[in-house]
Amino acid sequence: MIRIAIDAMGGDFGAEPIISGVIEALKEAEFKAVLVGDSNAIKPLIPQPYLKNIEFIEATEVISMSDGATDALKRKDSTIYKAVELLKEKEVDAVVSAGHSGATMSLATLRVGRLKNVSRPAIATLMPNSKETATLVLDVGANVDCRSEHLFQFAIMGEAYAKEILGRKEPKVGLLSNGEEESKGNEVSKEAFKLVSRLDSFVGNAEGNQIFDGSIDVMVCDGFMGNILLKTSEGVADAIGKIIKKQVKKSPLAMAGSVLMRKVFKTLKKQVSYDEYGGAPLLGVNGCVIISHGKSNSKAIKNAIFQAIKFANSNINKVIEEELSHFAR
């Protein structure tokens, strides 16, 4: 049975939405949940019938968002440190955390280690597109500064994830740039273009709008650009939702129409909500680490757990190592 360590205290809203997400996941999937945190605070939130599929690991500290990522290495009694340590010792198959993403990434990289030939792990996230297939974008925050070879490795890892986890037989990989021409981009991206061109899946430079029109499956960029892209798209989606609500309230006719379009709005909200994707895998580490949004609700945690189960049951890390070995110097 798959064993998943879950940082039970790391989210912005405490343990309640995390535990609710675990319970929802246990209703639909068979796995062992290893909850890391204060059991005295966690146990009262769990209905008796689910306790048989839950284990508790005591941890008294929580890494807050105001703490530095490197502080986590010294806080050995923190929830995320203990969760990652369980993965390192192979006592669990995956880790899910909605806590400090920088701390999670640092601990996973330094304690669990990187896959062979991986220089830097990358955070990969799914973003909605008009074809309803979702586009994988990486890196979205793990590496602010990248060299061309790092972007090349991200492309290989993203392609492998698209094939093994998303089921895309022939994924199209693009390099995020300010134009499709080979001459576009900065010096790093131009050099990366030459390297990524060795992949049959590479379709060339791609502009930001192609993430959302579904014309590519994997978009590669550095973590600085990727994180801005992610946060901007979240902000735009939120703003559009608020604008629609305001405009609907201004007109009785619009309000009547919104009732008729309720199903459409519900489908749209579902498609653009991060709750549906659950979390972002940290690709390139020697294990399965899913980083969830700090504001994750129970549905997001449930889907992050499902994502971890699928990852843990796959050969994704083996595939990444094999693909990278073909290009190792």
Swiss-Prot record:
GO CC terms, sorted: cytoplasm
Keyword check for Lipid metabolism: yes
Pfam families reported in the protein's UniProt record: FA_synthesis
GO terms for biological process, alphabetical: fatty acid biosynthetic process; phospholipid biosynthetic process
Gene Ontology molecular function, alphabetical: phosphate:acyl-[acyl carrier protein] acyltransferase activity
Metabolic or biological pathway, per its Swiss-Prot or TrEMBL entry: Lipid metabolism; phospholipid metabolism
E.C. number: 2.3.1.274
Segments traversing the membrane: none
Annotated keywords: Cytoplasm, Lipid biosynthesis, Lipid metabolism, Phospholipid biosynthesis, Phospholipid metabolism, Transferase
Catalytic reactions on record: a fatty acyl-[ACP] + phosphate = an acyl phosphate + holo-[ACP]
Annotated Gene3D superfamilies: Isopropylmalate Dehydrogenase
Compartments, as annotated in UniProt: Cytoplasm
Subunit relationships: Homodimer. Probably interacts with PlsY.
Role: Catalyzes the reversible formation of acyl-phosphate (acyl-PO(4)) from acyl-[acyl-carrier-protein] (acyl-ACP). This enzyme utilizes acyl-ACP as fatty acyl donor, but not acyl-CoA.
PANTHER family given in the database record: FATTY ACID/PHOSPHOLIPID SYNTHESIS PROTEIN PLSX, PHOSPHATE ACYLTRANSFERASE
Family: Belongs to the PlsX family.
Name the UniProt record assigns to this protein: Phosphate acyltransferase
Originating species: Campylobacter concisus (strain 13826)
